[in-house]
Each structure stands twice: as C-alpha cells, then as structure tokens.
Amino acid sequence: MKIRPLHDRVIIKRIEAEAKSAGGIVLTGTAAQKSTRGEVLAVGTGRILDNGDVKALAVKVGDKVIFNEGYGVKTEKLDGQDVLILSETDILAIVEE
C-alpha cells in the first residue's frame, strides 16, 4: 500500500532508540522511552498560504529528523510497519550527519 500525504503533512518512520541507560543498564517496558527521531518517507505538496500560494516543505524524503510527538501526530500501519503522519510544524530539527 502507498500513502501520499496531503499539503504540509509528512510521513515518518520512527528510528528506535537504543534501550540502554547511560550506565549500560538495559531498559524494558515503561522505562524505555519512545524515540522522537525518525526518517522522512514521504512529504506533501506544501503548505497553502493565506493568499493561496503553496510553500514547499523544508524537509525531503530521506531526511533524519527530530519531531514533537504531540496531539496532531497520527500512527498508521503501512506494509506491516508503524509510521507517523504529522504536520511539518511538528518537526523540530533536521539531523545532519
């Protein structure tokens, strides 16, 4: 199945954080936090401005990002894998390696 996001929406695959503490203790269950990093899988056409123009998104497919997992984030299954659908405004930063 393919999903094509609309407007300023972005589809992200979560990059799982390592489940170890700084001291090397393996974290399980509720002790392990969900990662707020992900890889952009698809982007919409852009944000529609008040004057009707469309502004292209700052992120592109393949970007590694840090996002805010808040109220507007939707989780969906895509080919057996959980993906997140969120607005570009929920993306806090692009990780440059």
From Swiss-Prot:
Keyword Cytoplasm in record: yes
Subcellular location(s) of the protein: Cytoplasm
Chain's gene name: groES
Organism, as annotated: Aeromonas hydrophila subsp. hydrophila (strain ATCC 7966 / DSM 30187 / BCRC 13018 / CCUG 14551 / JCM 1027 / KCTC 2358 / NCIMB 9240 / NCTC 8049)
Protein known as: Co-chaperonin GroES
Gene Ontology annotations of biological process type: chaperone cofactor-dependent protein refolding
The keyword Cytoplasm is annotated on this UniProt entry: yes
Short name of one Pfam family: Cpn10
NCBIfam families, alphabetized: PRK00364.1-1, PRK00364.1-2, PRK00364.2-2
Cellular component per GO, a single term: cytoplasm
HAMAP family with a match to the protein in the record: CH10
Role description: Together with the chaperonin GroEL, plays an essential role in assisting protein folding. The GroEL-GroES system forms a nano-cage that allows encapsulation of the non-native substrate proteins and provides a physical environment optimized to promote and accelerate protein folding. GroES binds to the apical surface of the GroEL ring, thereby capping the opening of the GroEL channel.
Family statement: Belongs to the GroES chaperonin family.
MF terms (GO), sorted A to Z: ATP binding; metal ion binding; protein folding chaperone; protein-folding chaperone binding; unfolded protein binding
